[in-house]
C-alpha cells in the first residue's frame, strides 16, 4: 500500500509535461470562499437598500400623482356641473321661448292662415267647378260607385253565348230574390206615393216618386222626393239599391209627372208644375211651367224653372208633360220623353191597322189621336232636349215625334243602352199591345217598333187587353218593359195581367209571341197601378229591379214596392 501511495503522490507532483505543480492547501481554499461570500452578501444588501430607496421614491411620486388626479377629477366635476347648469338654463330659456311662440301660433297665427287658405281653396274649387269642362272632374271627387262588375244591362253584350244561341227559359220558374227595400214612403195613413221613376247610370242611380199627403188625386198638393244611390251586393250576393242622398222638394211647388236621368255623379229631374187640372190645361193655349232639378251626392240642389215663352217649341202646345219614365244623357244634352196636346193638329197618317177590322180606314186612326175628353186636342209624343245641362242656365228645346212614326202620345221611357236608344210608350189608345222599339234621334226622327203579340195591358171595355182595332179611346196603364235582346224582341216587364181591371201584377219574361216565364206577385185580386222594370248585369249575370205601385187595400192607398228577379236566360247548345 505504501508503494501505491508513493506512486499516487508522484502522479500529483509531476505534470504530464514533466513540470512540477504546487498543490493549494484546504485552509487557503476556504479563505477565498469566505471572501466571495462576503462580497456577495454586501452586494445583496446594497441592492436591497437601493430597491427600498427606489420604492420610496416611486411611492412618493405616486402619492403626488394621485393627489393631482383627485384634484383634476374634482375640477372636471365642478366644470361639468357648471356646463350642465348653463346648458339647462339655456335650454329652459329656449324651450320657454319656443313654447310661447308655438302657443301663439296655434291660438292665433295658424287658424288665421288656415282660414285664409281654406277660403282660397274654396274659391278656386268653386271657380273651377263652375266651368263646364271641369264639372265632371269636380264631381269625380265623390267616391260613390256601383259595386265592381255591376252595370246597366246592355242587350248587345248580354244577349249572346260562348257557344249556341241565347233564349229565355221557362224552367225553373222565376222567384223573388231577398234583400231590403229603401224606397221613400209616406208618414200618414192616407198618404199616396205615385209615379216611380228609376234611372240606372254607369256610376249611380236616381229614383224619384211623388208623395200626395191626402189621397191619390193628381192635382193634389204633393212632395217630390229625389234619391241618389249606388247598387251594392248583399250577403246573398244579390244586388240592392242603396240610397246615399235624398232631397224632398217643397209641397207648395206641386211637382207632377217627373222623369229622371242619372249621369256622372248627379241626378236630373224634369217635372211639370201645374196650377190647373189636366183637362183644364188641355183646353187652354200654352203649357204649364217646367222645372229642371239637379241633385248631387253632397246633397246640393239647384232648380231651373221655365215658362212657356222660355222653351223652344217646334209647334204651339196647349199642354205638355214629362213622360214619368227615365230619360237619357247624351254628349252635352239630356233627353226626356214627353207627351201633350198640340194647339193645331199636324197633318199626316199615323200608325194604323186596317186588316181584320171592320169599317176602319186610315182616317179612323188619324182621328183617334184627337181625344174628346182632352178638348179634342191631337195628343203626340215629344223629345224634350235639355241642352248645355252643365251650364248656369240650360236651354230646353221640344221636338215633336212625327205622327207617322207613332201611336197616341202617352207616358213612356227612353233607354240608351250601348249605341242604341230604346223607346217605350204606354198603350193609352186603341193599340193595346206592348209598344217598344228602337229610336233614331237623327233627323228625321224614326222609330222601329218591335211587334209584341203576347204582352198587353188592361183597359176600358172598348180598349181592353185584346183590342187591336182602331178607335178613339184613352185608357191603359204605364207598365214599361226592358229590352234584353238588341231588337227588343225579348223583354222583362211587370204586367197587370187582366182584361179591364188594374189587378194581378205579374213579373213576365217574354218574347214577341209567348210569355216564357212569369211570377204572380200575390193573387189575381191584388190591386196595382204603374210598374217600371230596370235591369243590370253583374259580371254577365242578369238581374232586374221591378217597382210596382201596390194598392194597400186596407188603407186604400198606393205605395211603390221593390222586387228583384234573376233573368232566366240560357244558352241553346248547337246541334
From Swiss-Prot:
Under the cellular component aspect of Gene Ontology, which terms does the record hold?
Answer: host cell plasma membrane; membrane; viral envelope; virion membrane
Q: Where is this region: Incorporation in virion?
A: 10-14
Domain free text: The C-terminus (head domain) is involved in binding the cellular receptor.
Transmembrane regions listed in the UniProt entry? 38-58
GO terms for MF: exo-alpha-sialidase activity; host cell surface receptor binding
Q: Which portions of the chain have biased composition (kind: Basic and acidic residues)?
A: 1-10
Q: What is the superkingdom listed in this entry's lineage?
A: Viruses
> What processing steps or modifications follow its translation?
N-glycosylated; glycans consist of a mixture of high mannose-type oligosaccharides and of complex-type oligosaccharides.
Organism of origin is: Sendai virus (strain Ohita) (SeV)
Q: Which UniProt keywords apply?
A: Disulfide bond, Glycoprotein, Hemagglutinin, Host cell membrane, Host membrane, Host-virus interaction, Hydrolase, Membrane, Signal-anchor, Transmembrane, Transmembrane helix, Viral attachment to host cell, Viral envelope protein, Virion, Virus entry into host cell
> Which residues does the annotation flag as glycosylated?
77, 499, 511
Keyword Ribosomal protein listed? The answer is no
Q: What ranges does the record give for the region Involved in neuraminidase activity, renumbered to this chain? A: 254-259
Name of this chain's protein: Hemagglutinin-neuraminidase
What task does this protein carry out? Answer: Attaches the virus to sialic acid-containing cell receptors and thereby initiating infection. Binding of HN protein to the receptor induces a conformational change that allows the F protein to trigger virion/cell membranes fusion. Neuraminidase activity ensures the efficient spread of the virus by dissociating the mature virions from the neuraminic acid containing glycoproteins.
Q: Which family does it belong to?
A: Belongs to the paramyxoviruses hemagglutinin-neuraminidase family.
Catalytically driven reaction(s): Hydrolysis of alpha-(2->3)-, alpha-(2->6)-, alpha-(2->8)- glycosidic linkages of terminal sialic acid residues in oligosaccharides, glycoproteins, glycolipids, colominic acid and synthetic substrates
What EC number(s) is this enzyme filed under? 3.2.1.18
Task: Give all cystine bridges in this chain.
Answer: 192-216, 258-271, 357-469, 463-473, 535-544
Q: Where is this region: Disordered?
A: 1-25
Where does the protein end up? Virion membrane; Host cell membrane
Amino acid at each position: 500500500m505504501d508503494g501505491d501511495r508513493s506512486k499516487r503522490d508522484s502522479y500529483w507532483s509531476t505534470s504530464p509535461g514533466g513540470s512540477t505543480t504546487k498543490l493549494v492547501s484546504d485552509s487557503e481554499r476556504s479563505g477565498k470562499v469566505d471572501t466571495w461570500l462576503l462580497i456577495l452578501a454586501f452586494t445583496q444588501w446594497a441592492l436591497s437598500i437601493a430597491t427600498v430607496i427606489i420604492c420610496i421614491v416611486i411611492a412618493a411620486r405616486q402619492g403626488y400623482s394621485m393627489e393631482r388626479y383627485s384634484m383634476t377629477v374634482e375640477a372636471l366635476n365642478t366644470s361639468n356641473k357648471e356646463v350642465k347648469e348653463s346648458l339647462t338654463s339655456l335650454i329652459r330659456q329656449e324651450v320657454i321661448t319656443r313654447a310661447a311662440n308655438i302657443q301663439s301660433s296655434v291660438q292665433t297665427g295658424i287658424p288665421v292662415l288656415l282660414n285664409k287658405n281654406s277660403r282660397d281653396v274654396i274659391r278656386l274649387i268653386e271657380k273651377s267647378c263652375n266651368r263646364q269642362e271641369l264639372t265632371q272632374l269636380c264631381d269625380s271627387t265623390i267616391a260613390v260607385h256601383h259595386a265592381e262588375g255591376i252595370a246597366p244591362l246592355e242587350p248587345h253584350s248580354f244577349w249572346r253565348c260562348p257557344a249556341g244561341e241565347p233564349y229565355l227559359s221557362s224552367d225553373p220558374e222565376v222567384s223573388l230574390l231577398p234583400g231590403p227595400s229603401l224606397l221613400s214612403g209616406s208618414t200618414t195613413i192616407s198618404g199616396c206615393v205615385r209615379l216611380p221613376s228609376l234611372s240606372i247610370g254607369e256610376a249611380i242611380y236616381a229614383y224619384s216618386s211623388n208623395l200626395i199627403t191626402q189621397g191619390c188625386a193628381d192635382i193634389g198638393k204633393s212632395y217630390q222626393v229625389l234619391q241618389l244611390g249606388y247598387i251594392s251586393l248583399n250577403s246573398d250576393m244579390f244586388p240592392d239599391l242603396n240610397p246615399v242622398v235624398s232631397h224632398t222638394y217643397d209641397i207648395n211647388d206641386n211637382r207632377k209627372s217627373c222623369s229622371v236621368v242619372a249621369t256622372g255623379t248627379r241626378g236630373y229631374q224634369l217635372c211639370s208644375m201645374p196650377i190647373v187640372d189636366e183637362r183644364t190645361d188641355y183646353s187652354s193655349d200654352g203649357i204649364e211651367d217646367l222645372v229642371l232639378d239637379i241633385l248631387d251626392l253632397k246633397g246640393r240642389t239647384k232648380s231651373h224653372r221655365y215658362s212657356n215663352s222660355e222653351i223652344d217649341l217646334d209647334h204651339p202646345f196647349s199642354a205638355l208633360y214629362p213622360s214619368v219614365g227615365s230619360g237619357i244623357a247624351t254628349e252635352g244634352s239630356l233627353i226626356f220623353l214627353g207627351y201633350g196636346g198640340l194647339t193645331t193638329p199636324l197633318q199626316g197618317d199615323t200608325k194604323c191597322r186596317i186588316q181584320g177590322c171592320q169599317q176602319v180606314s186610315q182616317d179612323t186612326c188619324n182621328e183617334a189621336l184627337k181625344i174628346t175628353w182632352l178638348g179634342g186636342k191631337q195628343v203626340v209624343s215629344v223629345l224634350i232636349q235639355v241642352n248645355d245641362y252643365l251650364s248656369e242656365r240650360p236651354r230646353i228645346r221640344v221636338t215633336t215625334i212625327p205622327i207617322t212614326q207613332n201611336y197616341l202620345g202617352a207616358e213612356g221611357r227612353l233607354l240608351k243602352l250601348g249605341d242604341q236608344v230604346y223607346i217605350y210608350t204606354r198603350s193609352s189608345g186603341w193599340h193595346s199591345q206592348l209598344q217598344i222599339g228602337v229610336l233614331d234621334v237623327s233627323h228625321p226622327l224614326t222609330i222601329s217598333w218591335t211587334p209584341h203579340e203576347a204582352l198587353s195591358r188592361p183597359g176600358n171595355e172598348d180598349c181592353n187587353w185584346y183590342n187591336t182595332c182602331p178607335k178613339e179611346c184613352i185608357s191603359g196603364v204605364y207598365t214599361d218593359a226592358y229590352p234584353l235582346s238588341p231588337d227588343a224582341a225579348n223583354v222583362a216587364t211587370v204586367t197587370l195581367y187582366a182584361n179591364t181591371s188594374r189587378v194581378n201584377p205579374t213579373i213576365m219574361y217574354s218574347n214577341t209571341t209567348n210569355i216564357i216565364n212569369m211570377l204572380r206577385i200575390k193573387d189575381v185580386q191584388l190591386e196595382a197601378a204603374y210598374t217600371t222594370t230596370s235591369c243590370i248585369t253583374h259580371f254577365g249575370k242578369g238581374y232586374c229591379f221591378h217597382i210596382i205601385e201596390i194598392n194597400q187595400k186596407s188603407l186604400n192607398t198606393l205605395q211603390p214596392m221593390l222586387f228583384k228577379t234573376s233573368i232566366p236566360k240560357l244558352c241553346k247548345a248547337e246541334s
